[in-house]
Design a protein with these regions (language model features):
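Conserved NTP-binding catalytic cores of kinases and kinase-like/nucleotidyltransferase enzymes
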Residues: 1-86, 180, 194-204, 314-331
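Secondary-structure capping and boundary motifs in well-ordered enzyme cores
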Residues: 140, 178, 183, 212-213, ...
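Active-site activation/catalytic loop segments of kinase-like enzymes and analogous catalytic loops
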Residues: 146-155, 216-250, 264-281, 293-301
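ATP/Mg2+ or Mg2+-diphosphate-binding catalytic cores
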Residues: 272-331
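Residue immediately N-terminal to the catalytic "proton-acceptor" Asp
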Residues: 184, 189
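Catalytic activation segment of kinase domains across protein kinase-like and atypical kinase folds
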Residues: 191-223, 227-230
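An alpha-helical support segment within catalytic cores of ATP-dependent transferases
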Residues: 5, 9, 14, 126-135, ...
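ATP-binding pocket architecture of kinase catalytic cores
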Residues: 33-143, 147, 153-154, 176
């Protein structure tokens, strides 16, 4: 039986000049996208298979062009078929931060480069012709925070509205101005070391197609409160200080409050998403990270601005009932 997707892929590779080259699967992510490496004569490229309607490669192409225009390292798009959902991309290799850190690489040096890249991104003047990006506004942030009570701990409609009302009251304090470009998944799985490139161009950027404009602290929180690995407290503090030193106009107290709220919102979202990936998509591998995400969330909730959320969770999802999404049922 013929596989229409395989046939479409073969036609795309033929048109791009890579016909007949073996496509070796690469590690995937939590999306519907799949990746393959193709190599010949000492060179290689990466094929992104992003099947519509679940995926749309248009934002990836636009954001990649923007990042490259800003002097940062995003993969060059070598060929594209937007209708079929195929991209042929520059191959950045295998030196992801995740892999390097697991192999004992210099952790402070890698995080310093990542923070410097984030600073450069936020300092760069937006060039003309930038794509119109969605705003990371209140409704979008609420829609993510509610994933906790939609998937991890389903609650009756009245409690759901109560939870949302608390977030509506708190989130305005997270919206520090001016808004900036937010990549949203800025963490070690999506950063790759390019040692032959100077300065911040040595930090390759991946998985940025969901970029938005939003609060400046979001990507720093994403980097330093990583759902997949523990980061030493002193390193977190040093990297936060490095970031804040680059933006002396930011009021530190205001930023600290914003960052705590964004971190808690993000961790509520992650708990919901990891549970959804298991319950809906059969991807159990993300459940191993849930205890760490709860630890991060509980630390975030120590900020006074998050007291109402902390008290709500203590009532409806007390500490002894956490870390086990398989035991959650509707309250």
């Amino acid at each position: 039986m013929h596989d229409p997707r395989r046939q479409a892929m073969a036609a795309f590779l033929d048109a791009a000049g890579w016909a007949g080259v073996r496509a070796a699967p690469l590690a995937g992510d939590a999306s519907f996208r799949r990746y393959y490496r193709l190599g010949r004569n000492g060179s290689s490229v990466v094929l992104m298979d992003a099947p519509p309607p679940q995926e749309d490669i248009g934002p990836y192409v636009a954001i990649a062009a923007l990042l490259r225009e800003l002097g940062l390292s995003a993969p060059e798009v070598l060929a594209e078929d937007r209708e079929q959902g195929f991209l042929l991309l520059e191959d950045f290799g295998d030196d992801t931060y995740t892999r390097l850190l697991a192999g004992g690489a210099d952790e402070p040096a890698l995080y310093t480069l990542a923070v410097d890249t984030l600073i450069a991104l936020q300092c760069a003047a937006t060039p003309r012709g930038t794509p119109e990006l969605p705003s990371y506004d209140m409704e979008r942030l609420l829609g993510e925070a509610v994933l906790l009570v939609d998937w991890y701990r389903p609650v009756a409609s009245g409690l759901r509205e109560e939870y949302l009302a608390l977030w509506r009251a708190i989130l305005p304090d997270a919206m520090v101005s001016p808004p900036t470009l937010v990549l949203r998944d800025y963490h070690v799985d999506n950063l790759i070391l390019l040692p032959n490139r100077p300065g911040v161009r040595g930090c390759g950027l991946l998985d940025f197609q969901d970029a938005v404009t939003g609060p400046p602290g979001y990507d720093l929180v994403s980097l330093l409160e990583d759902a997949r690995r523990d980061i030493p407290g002193p390193l977190q503090q040093a990297m936060t200080e490095r970031y804040l030193t680059a933006f002396p106009a930011l009021d530190r107290s205001t930023f600290s409050r914003s960052a705590a709220i964004l971190a808690a919102q993000r961790n509520c979202k992650i708990l919901g998403i990891f549970t959804r990936l298991w319950k809906r998509d059969g991807k159990r591998q993300y459940l191993v990270h849930i205890p760490r995400v709860w630890r991060l969330l509980e630390a975030d909730l120590g900020h006074p601005a998050l007291g109402p959320i902390a008290r709500w969770l203590d009532r409806h999802l007390p500490p002894e009932a956490r870390c086990r999404p398989d035991l959650q049922s509707e309250a």
